[in-house]
Amino acid sequence: MINFLGTSKIETERLILRRMEISDIQKVFDHWLSDERVSDNRASAAHKTVAETSERVEKIISNYASKEFCWWAIERKVDRELIGEIDLYDFDITTGNCKVSYSIGYEWWNQGYGTEALKAVVEFGFQYMNLHKISAAHNTDNPASGKIMRKAGMVQEGIIRHMIRNAKNQYKDCVIYGILQEDYFKT
């Protein structure tokens, strides 16, 4: 049975995973949601206006009232810079399974922040929420995301053809990864 805890603050060696705040809107826009290099790996298009980002962040904040909502802003400890987001979603209470997704601003790619955030959320999911399985997917054009998933202990489970259609109206194949609670606790 899933122990829903909402979006609890999580700290790692270099990061603070915390709730989004209204004051984050400009940085969310500037650091990843308006950047096509990041949005090319997401299902949704890059934001053209801060108003789009504002609407999205306000919706996230309004969902924090639910214990079943787990969406973190990723902040660096060293300079309090907001660099990305990560969330657990699509909970199946029958199986105890869910999915995870994340976005990191381009400036912070290849510095280990995605891996560090994902490891922390996987730990939170298994240790505190009693999840059975956490799954993730990345499009085949983004193998760096698969590397993050593997470093967090996930294993490749397959490829789903044309799993998503991106903002450029292109179908993308996605690689599926997963990690089971029992495997997490073996390591």
Indicate where each model-derived feature is located:
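Acyl-donor (CoA/ACP) binding surface of acyl/acetyltransferases
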Residues: M1-K27, H31-S39, E58, E75-T187
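Short, surface-exposed helix-loop/turn micro-motifs enriched in polar/charged residues
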Residues: S44-A45, S66, G96
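Conserved GNAT-fold acetyl-CoA-binding loop/helix
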Residues: R37-K59
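Hydrophobic residues in alpha-helical segments
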Residues: W32, R42, Y64-A65
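A short helix-loop-beta-strand connector motif used in the catalytic cores of GNAT acetyltransferases and
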Residues: I60-A73
